[in-house]
Amino acid sequence: MFKSLFILFITVSSLLSMTGFANSGSTITSANCTFQLENPTRGNCSSVVIAPGNDTKVNLLLLNQDKLKKPLNAPTFPNLTPRSANHVFFWSDVKTQIINMDEENRRWWHTPSHCVSFEGGTRDYNKAVSINKAIPESEKNLLYQAREILGVMCAYSDSVSTTYPLEAIGINSSQGSMFLSYIKAAAYFYGEAWPQAIEKFSLISDSPDPWIREASLYMIARTQLIQASVSAIDRWGIFLGPDLVDKDLLNKAQISMEFYLLNYPNGRYTSSAVGFLRRLMFLNSDYPALTQEYARLTSATDLSTRNGLTNLEEIDRLSSQLSLTPGTIRLAVNILALMRSGDHNQISKKELESQKQYFSNDPALYSFLLANYAFYVEKDFREVLKLIPDEAQKNSFLPLEFSRQALRGMALSALDDVDVQRFWQDMLNGVDVIYQRPIVELGLTTNYERKDKLTEVFKKGSLIKDSYIRKTRLLYAADYDILRDQAQNDTRPKTEKDLALFILLYKQLTRGRYEEFVIDAQLVPEKANTHNHYISELEPDSKIPVGIFRDGIWSDGYPCPSISITSGQLAFNKSKGTLDSNQKKNSQYAKALLCLGDFYRLNNIDRLLDRQFSKEPSPSKTIRRGNFYSNLINDPSVDSNDKAYALYRVIKCYSPSGNNSCGGESVNQAQRKDWFKLLKGKYGKSKWAKELNYYW
């Protein structure tokens, strides 16, 4: 009998949601993760500074941890590379990394909802079997295997088939038969045959075994709740609304759930049953009761657990349907979200002030909300300082305390206050290393940069310990001297040295500092990375292709030496004055310039030229190969083969889209046609004229 029963239900026909609706949430989906102090809008990721731009779930978790006086449980950085070095994150990163979930929990996030508890249920079942002395050992092994086979029903597979390897006749003891009956009921449950599951669990709900008795009562209520929701869930597992729920079945589920809790107020499944009661409140549209329950959850229970995260996402998902009056944490999170820049329904100052009554027991949180409004909406930075006193010298910071002081630091920075450096330095003494310290270091670094003291970031014994912060400054702010020093600083990680050297050589080459390039290119190590396909997306945590300056591609038809030799030729001609636009360029210079253009093209340097990698000069001041070619075309001193190649290349700049991919001043199609006619006519015998059949 059991064999046919198992095969009958072994294929899971649909992913019915135990939680009742799809996870819409408010998780940020943008890939834009910028590590920055201010966070005014959803366009960026979240950080440990509670702010309007954070995912509302992150803010809710931070405030929950603050209420419980707990720091974030973060033994290490999450693996977010290349998204801003782990200091900012998506909500999904919080779930998988900050909470430090184990392998079982990671699987739990991606399991059909009614199968979520399978592994935990298996452990409970196996333990109950093992301690039941009335079951022979030989039968226990059969019962363990029977439970294990049920797991196939929760596997993702289009076609799953198996056979039950043991005959039911192998279980002869009374207690063993009771556990086998539980397995049969569970098979109906995992096979989504809800009425049959309820019937089978009911038959064993008065079992003499204490675990079967409790588990069966719990499973009756759980199955009834799922059955009541079936009519409100479409084929894709999307919840269609409470109105489509079977209210009669829902009432039965509520009676069963309350009966379980009455008999087991501190049972194995009490926490889960309380969660199901919240689901019943939702399905019955009892939002006042649900609001009260969520207020209790956010203030009194730890949301940084597996069950807590489920509750947190549930709270966030339903926030628009619930009253905001009770529970200052949830109200605060919603108010912060209404401060986001660009939102059409941004909260007004009058509306914010009208909420004061709800924060009578939490003045620090309310003044923090007022300070956020002053900073992000009103841009009244002095008001922020009035609302948040200086407490930078604390020995430690809970999430709200840290966020308050970080906001004060941002206001000081916005005012360019003389005290800002001292403030950030004081905060360093009390912050945690993993998440809080990088925020404070960023504030301090920003001040150094503003005061033209960027060397403070890189000097020996610097207060700035964070590698990512140093790399961002190498990429976007460091001058030639800092870049050269860091490229040779053996106390730094290889990634920092490679980045410093790459930016140094790139800037030298594209700004015409050829003599310096020849000298510094000797610093490129052997076998350095040359993979440059994603060079346009170069970020601090990218794998740096510094090897292109030593072992890059020099030529694909036009003969060119290494880029160091080419740069040496350009440096020599520059010293002779042949780079002066008013002087004729000699043949050596023309060839070197064409080879520089080929280096740009073959190593994807073109893709970088519009990036702003430093304050001086701007990208518009970089030397573009489009300009190389047009200048050489118009120079009568350039020999015919080089001029033909310049024509060939400048026309190809517009292939295939008609847009200029070479930089420099773009020309219209008529000009490109004239170039093509010139190449095909005057230089028609050249290799380059023969290879080009179109213009764009």
Question: Positions of the model-derived regions?
Answer:
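Alpha-helical solenoid repeat scaffolds
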Residues: 2-5, 20-198, 207-696
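Bacterial N-terminal signal peptides
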Residues: 7-17
